[in-house]
């Protein structure tokens, strides 16, 4: 592990993306606990890819270990897509001896401000093999009518 922090966390310049609502943690990659200890959980910091095609905005989130019934999708404030879920800590048996606990638990909340061309009333989602895919169709760009004008003379 490098002692020099990666200030952009390997993300694709989301610091410059006006639609991303991620909270930047400058201490995320340092070898000591962050002040935002909940952000240290791999589950809480679920990575989401967002691509735009000519027809839609497509989000893909890795959410292993959750069933589709445990994931909640909402459109808030008219244009904010919120993906949330929760993975609970496994119940502990007093007779068991744990040697390693690496699987993360906690709450997941990710929000993305959708652009004006998003059809928020037609959002579709599917989940397969721990990957959530959310498709937000786009409004068709209406080209202005072009009218030919005769030139006299």
UniProtKB/Swiss-Prot annotation:
Cytoplasm found in the keyword field: yes
CDD domains noted in UniProt: ACD_ScHsp26_like
Keywords: Cytoplasm, Stress response
Keyword Cytoplasm part of the UniProt annotation: yes
MF terms (GO), sorted A to Z: unfolded protein binding
Record-annotated sHSP domain positions: 39-153
Principal place of residence: cytoplasm
Cysteine disulfide partners in this protein: none
Recorded GO CC terms: cytoplasm
Cell location: Cytoplasm
GO biological process, one term: protein complex oligomerization
Transmembrane segments annotated in the record for this chain: none
Record text on subunit structure and interactions: Forms oligomeric structures.
Protein family (similarity comment): Belongs to the small heat shock protein (HSP20) family.
The protein, known as: 17.3 kDa class I heat shock protein
Originating organism: Glycine max
Biological classification of the source: Eukaryota, Viridiplantae, Streptophyta, Embryophyta, Tracheophyta
Gene for this chain: HSP17.3-B
